[in-house]
């Protein structure tokens, strides 16, 4: 913003006129010289001296020239002695050629602290132009603190419009005031409520309803009937969307756990605006396990109409749907029980201490534990010594259900968990009802005393072999091998019959496979095959490390262990030398 020095300011230092462009200020023949002489009726001003280092022309100021003082436009000139006559050579100096008229503005001149930018065009002292009005006061708020700022701005705009040339401007060096502060926008981008109601949501709701196309918010007289804590929730004849109940109201009757649903149906004189009524059903809780409602006034049909029923369209003009003006009809007190009661009800549902008596067969069906039923002939002749499977619990007493088939035996049956079966009836089946604070829900049986000793090993050998399972494992064992060795002293069993037959040759000593070269007999064909390789010299198995070949795979495996030991010793040796940290190994060396 261009600012001029006002009246009463101290006399500035002789200004240095910097050439911006075109004819220099003060040069003979310039437009400023001609217009100034015509306006004041005086001769042209003396040419101001220039600093040698400010212009690349290298011109030196004249010794007799005196720098004129700064004069505002319209200010009467003080009486002064006539300027000294200039030499004829200087007065008749021709106009500078167009090639030498170039801009002399340097970027370093902007960094000078005492440089004041002034837009002075060639018509600085000319009369103000009639076409351009004066600058309004609101357009120059930053220059009001400076004397004569408004006049200067008006002069600057008028002179610029009169001359039409914005190229000529100069810097006036000297003590200059601090530049005016920059303009800043102090507006607000948020919505301010009425000072009397700083947190009134009506203004925001009216704004949003205008955007979303909803009905306007009711007046403050309708909201006056509500409590102060209910202010964030809409009420009135135009409250189409219900809000959640107040969680922090003084009376806990309006609790956040509605029993069936809550409604907001204030519509007086305008039944067409009462459009929707929310019906929120409680979560899916079995009616048999749900706590009774807090009041008989609750309609069970509407309470359990459906899980979270959607918005239902009400009949327009139906009686009882619309209330009085500004009446916020919440659900009755029975639908909003005390929050403490509701918490107890929820705890009683989620963590029931007592449940209604339900038959045990409902919770535990009869066929729930019929796992791996066995036929009597599956285990052979020694099946009477094997333990039985788990007895499915029945609903009435200790008697077994009809879902499982068990082996007939005079000895007490054992379950897969190592427990006595309920068919033995040695001890009653414990229930949750026998435990204090519980009711008749069937529970797993309590571990009984240790089981009786097992039958003889002979009967067990003729049945299923223990295999990898422990001696106390009585699971159905689908991985058990069905073909056991018939020899009493042998406990081997096999999954395939050919494996059992090959095993029986060990007991009988039968060797049906004979070598044709040496007539040696073998009980297994693979043994004969490897034996023949000793005669033929065939060695199909080679070592991966040293390349040594072997006739049998087990020989190669035994030989590979030698290399593993050598590699371990070599790594220990390299680790002692410090090479192991570099990632070297025996194989790479």
Curated annotation (Swiss-Prot):
| InterPro entries (alphabetical) | Znf_C2H2_sf, Znf_C2H2_type
PROSITE patterns noted in UniProt: ZINC_FINGER_C2H2_1, ZINC_FINGER_C2H2_2
Q: Which GO terms describe its molecular function?
A: DNA-binding transcription activator activity, RNA polymerase II-specific; DNA-binding transcription factor activity; DNA-binding transcription factor activity, RNA polymerase II-specific; RNA polymerase II cis-regulatory region sequence-specific DNA binding; sequence-specific DNA binding; sequence-specific double-stranded DNA binding; zinc ion binding
Question: Bias category Gly residues: which stretches?
Answer: 395-404
Localization of this protein: Nucleus
GO BP annotations, alphabetical order: positive regulation of cell population proliferation; positive regulation of transcription by RNA polymerase II; regulation of transcription by RNA polymerase II
Q: Return any one Pfam family short name.
A: zf-C2H2
Q: Where is this chain compositionally biased, Pro residues type?
A: 76-86, 444-454
Task: Check the UniProt entry and state the signal peptide residues, or none.
Answer: none
Region (Disordered), start-end ranges: 29-101, 383-411, 436-466
Going by the entry's taxonomy, the superkingdom of the source organism is recorded as Eukaryota
The main location is nucleus
**Can you list the GO cellular component terms from the UniProt entry?**
chromatin; nucleoplasm
C2H2-type zinc fingers: which residues? 483-507, 513-535, 541-563
Keyword line: DNA-binding, Metal-binding, Nucleus, Repeat, Transcription, Transcription regulation, Zinc, Zinc-finger
Record's compositionally biased regions (Basic residues): 92-101
Expression induction per the record is: By PHA/PMA or by serum.
Q: Which PANTHER family match?
A: EARLY GROWTH RESPONSE PROTEIN 4, KRUEPPEL-LIKE TRANSCRIPTION FACTOR
Record family assignment: Belongs to the EGR C2H2-type zinc-finger protein family.
Q: What does this protein do?
A: Transcriptional regulator. Recognizes and binds to the DNA sequence 5'-GCGGGGGCG-3' (GSG). Activates the transcription of target genes whose products are required for mitogenesis and differentiation.
Name of this protein:
Early growth response protein 4
* Originating gene: EGR4
């Amino acid at each position: 913003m261009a600012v001029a020095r006002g009246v009463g300011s101290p006399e500035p230092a002789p200004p240095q006129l910097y050439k911006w462009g075109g004819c220099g200020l003060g040069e003979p023949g310039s437009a400023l010289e001609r217009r100034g002489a015509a306006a004041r009726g005086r001769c042209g001003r003396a040419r101001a001296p220039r600093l040698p280092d400010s212009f690349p022309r290298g011109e030196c100021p004249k010794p007799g020239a005196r720098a004129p003082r700064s004069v505002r436009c319209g200010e009467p000139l003080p009486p002064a002695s006539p300027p000294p006559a200039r030499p004829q050579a200087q007065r008749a100096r021709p106009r500078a050629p167009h090639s030498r008229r170039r801009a002399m503005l340097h970027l370093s001149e902007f960094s000078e602290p005492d440089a004041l930018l002034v837009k002075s065009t060639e018509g600085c002292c000319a009369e103000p132009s009639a076409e351009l009005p004066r600058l309004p006061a609101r357009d120059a708020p930053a220059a009001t603190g400076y004397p004569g700022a408004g006049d200067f701005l008006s002069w600057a705009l008028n002179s610029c419009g009169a001359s039409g040339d914005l190229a000529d401007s100069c810097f006036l060096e000297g003590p200059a005031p601090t530049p005016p502060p920059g303009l800043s926008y102090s507006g607000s981008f948020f919505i301010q409520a009425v000072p009397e109601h700083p947190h009134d949501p009506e203004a925001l709701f009216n704004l949003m309803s205008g955007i979303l196309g909803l009905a306007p918010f009711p007046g403050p007289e309708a909201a006056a009937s509500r409590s102060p804590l209910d202010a964030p929730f809409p009420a009135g004849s135009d409250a189409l969307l219900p809000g959640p109940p107040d969680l922090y109201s003084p009376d806990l009757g309006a609790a956040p756990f509605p029993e069936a649903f809550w409604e907001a149906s204030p519509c007086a004189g305008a039944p067409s605006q009462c459009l929707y009524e929310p019906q929120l059903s409680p979560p899916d809780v079995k009616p048999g396990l749900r706590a009774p409602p807090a009041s008989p006034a609750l309609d069970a049909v509407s309470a359990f109409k459906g899980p979270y029923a959607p918005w239902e369209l009400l009949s327009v003009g139906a009686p009882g749907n619309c209330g009085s003006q500004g009446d916020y009809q919440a659900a009755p007190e029975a639908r909003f029980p005390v929050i403490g009661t509701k918490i107890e009800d929820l705890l009683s549902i989620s963590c029931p201490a007592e449940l209604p008596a339900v038959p045990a067969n409902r919770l535990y069906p009869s066929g729930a534990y019929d796992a791996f039923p066995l036929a009597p002939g599956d285990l052979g002749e020694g099946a009477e010594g094997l333990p039985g499977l788990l007895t499915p619990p029945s609903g009435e007493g200790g008697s077994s259900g009809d879902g499982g088939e068990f082996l007939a035996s005079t000895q007490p049956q054992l379950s897969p968990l190592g427990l006595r079966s309920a068919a033995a009836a040695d001890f009653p089946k414990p229930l949750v009802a026998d435990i204090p604070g519980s009711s008749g829900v069937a529970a797993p049986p309590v571990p009984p005393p240790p089981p009786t000793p097992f039958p003889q090993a002979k009967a067990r050998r003729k049945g299923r072999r223990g295999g990898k399972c422990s001696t106390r494992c009585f699971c159905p064992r689908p991985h058990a091998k069905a073909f056991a060795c018939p020899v009493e002293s042998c406990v081997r069993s096999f999954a395939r019959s050919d494996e059992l037959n090959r095993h029986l040759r060990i007991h009988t000593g039968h060797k049906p496979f004979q070598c044709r070269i040496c007539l040696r007999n073998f009980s297994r064909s693979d043994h004969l095959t490897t034996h023949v390789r000793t005669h033929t010299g065939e060695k199909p198995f080679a070592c991966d490390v040293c390349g040594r070949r072997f006739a049998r795979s087990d020989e190669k495996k035994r030989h590979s262990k030698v290399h593993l030991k050598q590699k371990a010793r070599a790594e220990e040796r390299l680790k002692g030398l410090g090479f192991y940290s570099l990632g070297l190994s025996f194989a790479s060396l």
